[in-house]
Amino acid sequence: MTTLSHPAVAESLPTETLLGWLRDMYLIREFEIRTMQAYQNKKIGGFCHVYIGQEAVAVGCVAATRKNDPLVTAYRDHGHGLARGMDPKYGMAEMFGKLSGCAKGKGGSMHFFDAANSMYGGHGIVGAQTPLGAGLAFATKYEDEVMGGGKSDKVTLCFLGDGAVNQGAFHEAMNLAGLFDLPVIFIVENNGYSMGTAIERGTTMAHDLGAKARANGIDHITIQGMDVMSVYDGMKPFVDQCRENSRPGFVDMQTYRFKGHSMSDPRKYRTKEEEAEYEAQDPIGRLERVLKTQRDVADTDMEAIYDAQKKIVRGSVEFAENAPAPGLDELYKDVYVEPFGPWTGTSLPEMLANDPNYNGGAR
């Protein structure tokens, strides 16, 4: 299949749009800094994977979509949720295990969820979100075209790490997406390492991940993911094409995480020189320079935006600290679909057992 080219369109966008991207990246960066502090202070339990260094990917990709386009991702999910519009206080409360969290404190860091913004979760099993991405695309297409009788115009974004391309579920999802013409874009956030394993050591065709898309008849592009303007330039026409022809796509999004795979990762598999090389390409610094040199935005204006995001995140931490913990009764909620009631200790959910239309399980 042809590797698609893309024009430079971000340069023509209003300064206010670029400042909005900068604001969102500031928010993600500050949120993750405070997340690390809270984790180190043992206010956050479980696993924790921060998004520092990769902010341009989530912000640029989301900017290229509509709010009702489904999004699903892996366990490094904070950036995607915030970029999609999740209120950071509900994300922070989730990691603190509080009832007011975006998943009632039951998901934690790896399982942000915000249906109001079409963010269908972070998922903890490597590659497990890829069949869900294909399924979301199938659902929107079926709903719009079969049930609605029109043409589907939704595009699902399915984010995954480079390690997930080695999982069988990913290849099955790609095959079905190509076979059924599903409008899903698989975005590989290729930060070069699957936990501590360099991509060249664990993945065939590491220099050309697009080969995996071509094998399934899927168009693909490669994007420089350390620059939010490049991300938007690549994603906007690609998303538009997927929306128009209702076909899948594949993106090799080349990026770099500044921190470890998780909070417990000492990063001994990377050299200090390598890390310094990529930190010099900080996506936030890149956009700051563009705004300063090409849009005449003053340093003080950008500092004011950052200070505002810091205040929002501080408020989110305070909200999470003061939010109520879930009661023991929450253990029995969200187990069954709500119309069929909570578990009551009997062999059947209460409302289902009391339903006059229930036939005792006979078929």
Language model: regions and residue ranges:
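Short beta-alpha connecting loops at secondary-structure transitions
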Residues: 192-199, 218-224, 267-276, 300-302
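Short, proline-centered helix/strand-breaking motifs
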Residues: 183-186, 219
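Cofactor-binding active-site loop characterized by glycine-rich and histidine/acidic residues
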Residues: 36-37, 41-180, 198, 202-205, ...
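Glycine-rich, charged/polar anion/phosphate-binding loops
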Residues: 170-173, 233-240
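N-terminal amphipathic, basic-rich helices that act as targeting or association modules
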Residues: 1-76, 84, 301, 322-323, ...
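Short gly/pro/ser/thr-enriched loop/turn and capping motifs at secondary-structure boundaries
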Residues: 79, 192-195, 257-259
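Conserved thiamine diphosphate
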Residues: 141-152, 205-237, 280-306
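Glycine/aspartate-rich loop-and-adjacent alpha/beta segment that forms the canonical ThDP
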Residues: 2-4, 241-363
